[in-house]
Amino acid sequence: MQRRDLLKGALVAGAGLALPARLAASVMTGTPRERVLFDIAKRELDRAGSAIWKRDIVGIADFGLHSAKPRFHLVNLERGEVQSLHVSHGTGSDQEHDGWLKQFSNVEGSNATSRGAYVTWEWYVGRYGTSVRLGGLDPTNDAALRRYIVMHRAAYSESAHLAKWGRLGRSNGCFAFGEEQFRTALLNLSGGRLLYADSLGLEEDG
């Protein structure tokens, strides 16, 4: 059976990324949500092209889910695995502070989360300690550098905050994680990989 036959019927087809047989088998035996996430990762890698120089792991932030849910997915295309983390969205995207993202914005000063594909750049030490700069690749997020949109750790993204308030705190538009989960994101995603943000609403059962 051809690899393309294994992927037939997936949500997003024609991603243009050839996968080893062991990965194709792993993807087909995953959950419905994992299969959709792999399709999205391949599609966005293909769309980003040469702007992404490390293509093994893709981060997908699903802001269609409540902030209490692990909605930042590390999609490992080589191992056929998905690891999900908690991530905060921007205050300008959730002015009611109820844990739901209502809107995206690329406007400076909006403090909102931006939709689209990003390339992860170098680490630096800033207000929140080690952080990762992001370059926006779409018209919907191309102000990311000017807006200082980065990946960083934050106390308001810790599990203790979630347990107390039932939702994460909000960032100024950055992708903010708790300490341990930020370390996981940093090690897996920095240095030329793809981060894609959208409102997908993919629940755990697909």
What are these regions (language model features)?
Residues 5-25:
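N-terminal export signals
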Residues 26-172, 179-188, 193, 202-205:
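Cell wall/extracellular polymer interaction/catalysis modules
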